[in-house]
């Protein structure tokens, strides 16, 4: 089980626990910064369940790592969890362009992106 415990909500929530356990055992552990962002999203936002979460985030990073695009467009940044994961997989010269229409979410997200290890790859 992940660090999120019973409160974890992700796209695979409806899948049987053995499958989630298998996936969790075979993917990279969740980065501490992403974990803190996920927690802050669920504590400080109304729609925290919309955050991508660990499993989805690792999938996004894997896809970008395999494809190696120079540019990625994300429409709907929300708290920035998926943006950080996408940016992790980009090549050194890669850029992620992400847009958020909700001003309150942008205010929440901007510091998280700015303080991240991949801030130089994200245009927000």
What residue spans do the PLM features occupy?
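A short alpha-helical cap/connector motif
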Residues: 1-124
């Amino acid at each position: 089980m992940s660090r999120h415990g019973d409160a974890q909500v992700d796209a695979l929530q409806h899948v049987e626990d053995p499958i989630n356990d298998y996936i969790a055992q075979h993917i990279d552990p969740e980065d501490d910064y992403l974990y803190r962002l996920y927690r802050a999203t669920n504590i400080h936002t109304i729609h925290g369940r919309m955050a991508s979460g660990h499993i989805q985030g690792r999938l996004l990073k894997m896809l970008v790592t395999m494809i190696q695009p120079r540019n990625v467009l994300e429409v709907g940044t929300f708290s920035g969890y998926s943006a950080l994961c996408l940016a992790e997989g980009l090549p050194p010269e890669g850029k992620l362009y992400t847009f958020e229409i909700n001003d309150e979410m942008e205010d929440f997200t901007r510091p998280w992106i700015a303080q991240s290890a991949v801030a130089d790859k994200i245009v927000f």
